[in-house]
């Protein structure tokens, strides 16, 4: 993602005033910006494109994480749990690897950055403080 430059930036309305949003916009001053109420309709519309993942990767979506950022690593029965946790600060990838299972697995085809980073890290710190005897692998 070293040289990534989006063709368009979408910002959910409740994410537009965060410092990270302003920083990202300052990095791409010439890129068109569209403020949206929420990303559900945007994502649904993108899925109707002949190449939803490829076309959406050219856009950047800025939004707030709504409390899902720290969670157990997804697993399925009958596999043993690895006891890992994931911390989501972003979703997606700008690469086009044809073998990538994530292109079919992810429900959001856009490159997405969660801009409420301070809140995410505060929530993580609270979880760690509330569980001092638990070992977390993140």
Language-model segments: what does each one mean?
Residues 10, 34-35, 86, 98, ...:
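A structural signal for short, well-ordered beta-strand segments and their strand-loop junctions
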Residues 88-105:
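Local cysteine-cluster metal-coordination motifs and their immediate loop/turn environment
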Residues 1-83:
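Flexible, acidic/Gly-rich N-terminal and inter-domain linker regions that tether
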Residues 39-42, 84-91, 117-119:
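Short, glycine/charge-rich beta-strand/loop segments that flank catalytic centers
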Residues 63-79, 102-138:
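Conserved Radical SAM active-site core
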